[in-house]
Swiss-Prot record:
InterPro entries, alphabetized: Bact_response_regulator, CheY-like_superfamily, Sig_transdc_resp-reg_receiver
Transmembrane residue ranges: none
Protein name in UniProt: Protein Rrf1
Stated role: May be involved in regulation of gene transcription. Belongs to the family of response regulators, and members of this family involved in the regulation of gene transcription are two-domain proteins. This protein contains only the N-terminal phosphorylation domain and not the C-terminal DNA-binding domain but it may bind to Rrf2 protein and the latter may bind to DNA.
SUPFAM superfamilies referenced in this protein's UniProt entry, alphabetically: CheY-like (SSF52172)
Chain positions with 4-aspartylphosphate modification: D13, D53
One of the protein's GO biological processes: phosphorelay signal transduction system
Response regulatory domain span: 4-116
Length: 138
């Protein structure tokens, strides 16, 4: 079964590009352009890798990440940060890298491979996995 990639990206054009790239490479990929939609997608099916835009409106990027790592089976899901701030992955547990526009498809796919190799599905969770409720939609 192909690995599942969740793209959480405010810009629908960027989200569509990333999903298309990942699907063409043989992955199962879906996108959410808003935090609440991303929460629903994780609740429905655990992703193997998340590409996360930290600059979502209403601080949904950090809120989504903080919530996701508390969900059963999601504590070690690797995250690639879509941000202008190189090196930010050093401050975010489970982050395996950052990407910025313009996107290099070879780099994007290499980050997916690295994430999957580093965090094999089924790896025990290290963060608290108490199953925190979904963040408030406000």
């Amino acid at each position: 079964m192909p690995a599942r990639i969740l793209v959480v990206q405010e810009d629908p054009d960027i989200a569509a590009y990333l999903v298309s790239l990942f699907r063409q490479a043989g992955y199962k990929a879906d996108a959410a352009t808003e935090g609440p939609d991303a929460v629903e997608m994780v609740q429905a099916s655990r992703p193997d890798v998340v590409f996360l835009d930290l600059a979502l409106p209403q601080r949904w990027g950090p809120r989504f990440y903080s919530w996701m790592v508390t969900q059963p089976g999601c504590g070690n899901v690797p995250v690639v940060l879509v941000t202008d701030f190189a090196g930010l992955e050093l401050m975010v547990p489970n982050a395996v890298g950052t990407v910025d526009k313009p996107f290099d498809p070879v780099l994007l796919l290499a980050l997916v491979d690295r994430a999957l190799a580093t965090y094999a599905k089924g790896t025990p969770d290290t963060p608290d996995t108490t199953g925190a409720p979904a963040p408030d939609n406000r």
